[in-house]
Amino acid sequence: MTTEKGLLAEAESPPQDQKQEGEEEVESCTTQPVVGSGDKDPETEQSQESPSTTSPSTRKSKDRHSQGKGLSRLFSSFLKRPKSQVSSDEKEVELLGEKGQDQKDVDEGLGEQLEDDVFLKAPIAAPEPELRTDPSLDLHSLSSAETQPAQEEQKEDQDPEADCEDVEGKEPIKKPEGESKASHKVVRRSPNMRCKVTLLDDTVYECDLEKHAKGQDIFKKVCSHLNIVEEDYFGLAIWESPTCKVWLDPLKDIRKQVHGGPCEFTSNVKFYPPDPAQLSEDITRYYLCLQLRKDIFSGRLPCSFATLALLGSYTVQSEVGDYEEDLHGVDYVSEFKLSPNQTKDLEEKVGELHKSYRSMTPAQADLEFLENAKKLTMYGVDIHQAKDLEGVDIKLGVCSGGLMVFKDNLRINRFPWPKVLKISYKRSSFFIKIRPGEQEQYESTIGFKLPSYKAAKKLWKVCVEHHTFFRLTSTESIPKHRFLSLGSTFRYSGRTQAQTRHASALIDRPAPHFVRTGSKRASRSLDGAAVATPEASRTHRPVSAPVFPPEFPAVQRKTPGPRVEEMPKKTEEKPKEGMPNQRESPKDVKATQQDSPSPTVNGDKVKDLEKTQDEIIRHHASIRELKKSFMESVPAPRPSEWDKRLSTHSPFRTLSFNGQVQTGTDGPPLVKTQTVTISNATNGEKGEIPTKEVPLVHTETKTITYEAARSDDVNTDQEPGILLTAHTITSETTSSTTTTQITKTVKGGISETLIEKRIVITGDGDLDHDQVLVQAIKEAKEQHPDMSVTKGVVHQETEIA
């Protein structure tokens, strides 16, 4: 009976006894034989129990309890579960506890009847206090993985309290950490980027820009740093390789153009002006000179030995001023980087030419440098590697005049902009559509193969920019993006050359101050003074050049000082033309030109500083009229026999020399004429009536003329043309004098350039005129490959004893 009733009670209420007071896991294993009579029954029975009452059933129950206790200790770590599971079990205990209350009444009735049986089983509940303490002890023996979440929650709960209790101790520790983290985040999320620009004078300019800054932002900063107003000729380049550059687009973000690389750029001349004399400010011409010097030194602008020596002499004159033996010494030219293959002979020639310059300002030297450099074939040409349809390596050059094709460093074809109808590219091919000629009916398309698609697109962009800048009066509007539109929307976004010249004419500011690289002019002046410098005197001009008429500054700077006094000298000599027996030797003429005008020019410069602006303008206008009248009278006969023959035999010429034309050279056919004249001349002084006998000198004059056949559609005698510019370049040595006269005229809407070069050689020994002529023509063709020789005159005067 007792066993059946105990099993019945155990089956009816096992959950109620298992889930009370946090002892669910342990009690489920140790209280299975306990009858569900409630928690109070064992306590009451335990109090009534006497220590003397021991029966066999009691001993068996104690043994069973000791075995269960040992098992509970062994499996205590396995029976304990995480907190989340315990909480869920507690909820179940509450639900089961409600159901267990209904059964209490039934259990009480049964408890009275089974009092004896319960009394026998009461000692089983005696170790209950021990079982209550076991879970608390076992919690400390759980694995760290199970206790870590609970410990972390406790720490989080305790942190605010601990902070409130111990504010003074923990605040100084936590604040620096927060500040360091915040500062670290600021550096990481910095909106600015560092940009570095290498300028033409090899200095580095650095600036900070916003993260989304565009190309025009940094370009404006660079131009402001350089104090350049005529900024449209310049640009910033990104060098992808030592030989490949890409121009920075002013309308795009800088970050998108550098593609994550460093923001490092170089300042370069993007559009080379075809006529540098039209630039308004000296500082613009100076930076153009720096770019050309870099082009020559890097080999991008090849030139002959003679041209290189001439350009080098102007470079030295611009940087160090007039030559002074005490100051410069002997090897001062070697300090300049003039050529990639600089030799001792070149340095000696440059020094020899530099010593012949006197009273030439740096601005005049820069202008003479540009006037000679612009005649070179590769001046301002942007070279791109390509291949023709047959796979032959060629080079495509883009310049202000159009597209040019080079093969083995020789120009084999040229496509001027007026003849180009369309330029396009497809994949890695580049196409030029040519306008049909007078005898052609259809348009022709010429294709070239470039190394990659990117190279073809780059060439196309360069062509678009050059054509827009030099040929159009205003830029085209950028087309809007349309759905499924074909073609590129790229357009040149800056100002054109016409707009730049118009803006330059409106410049009204004092001449900007700038320091020349490597200049040694700060320690001395032209007259030997210790304080005043030519640079300082140049900066005292009240206004800049654009205040004067547009064409006047070019003539003023191009014409050296001696030209001012040539007109009065010529006027005095004209009445003597009727005296054939009296003439002046070329050597005397050279001496007259050297000695007379220099002091007058320097005096004018000193007086100009004390005059008002109106007086300066009137003074320069009068000089301009003198120069214009003199240059227009260049074809007129000269007083000497030698000058008269030169001028009268060359009414139409593009390039003429005092020498013979080399046989076999390209150009129009030349007709040879020879004149031999024997005349008597006296050595008496001009203007004096001979009052005594003067020894006669017999002179043999021999003139050989090579003249090209004239074109039928050009008649220079009937249409003299409008004079644009004219200037003279003179270089002297101990035995020869070279004078180059360059004149530009416009006839019938066509610009014509006339270059006349005269070489006067004096000496007692025999001279090989043929060799001199060959050398002169060779140098001329290297300097002016686009021009042809129309006339050559060899004039020889020999005194017969």
UniProtKB/Swiss-Prot annotation:
It is found in: Nucleus; Cytoplasm, Cytoskeleton; Cytoplasm, Cell cortex. One of its GO terms (molecular function) is actin binding. Residues 45-58 have a biased composition (Low complexity). Residues 477-587 are annotated as: Hydrophilic. Found exclusively in photoreceptors following the terminal mitosis of retinal neurons. When retinal synaptogenesis is complete, protein 4.1 is also expressed in the inner retina. In adult amphibian retinas, protein 4.1 is detected in photoreceptors, bipolar cells, and ganglion cell axons. Residues 108-117, 154-166 have a biased composition (Acidic residues). GO terms for cellular component: cell cortex; cytoskeleton; nucleus; plasma membrane. The keyword Cell division applies. One of its GO terms (biological process) is actomyosin structure organization. Residues 653-801 are annotated as: C-terminal (CTD). The keyword Cytoplasm applies. Keywords: Actin-binding, Calmodulin-binding, Cell cycle, Cell division, Cytoplasm, Cytoskeleton, Mitosis, Nucleus, Phosphoprotein, Transport. Coiled coil: none annotated. Gene3D superfamilies: 1.20.80.10, Phosphatidylinositol 3-kinase Catalytic Subunit, Chain A, domain 1, Pleckstrin-homology domain (PH domain)/Phosphotyrosine-binding domain (PTB). Residues 193-474 form the FERM domain. Residues 141-151, 591-601 have a biased composition (Polar residues). CDD domains: FERM_B-lobe, FERM_C_4_1_family, FERM_F1_EPB41. Protein 4.1 is a major structural element of the erythrocyte membrane skeleton. It plays a key role in regulating membrane physical properties of mechanical stability and deformability by stabilizing spectrin-actin interaction. May be required for dynein-dynactin complex and NUMA1 recruitment at the mitotic cell cortex during anaphase. PANTHER family: 4.1 G PROTEIN, PROTEIN 4.1. Binds with a high affinity to glycophorin and with lower affinity to band III protein. Associates with the nuclear mitotic apparatus. Binds calmodulin. This is Protein 4.1.
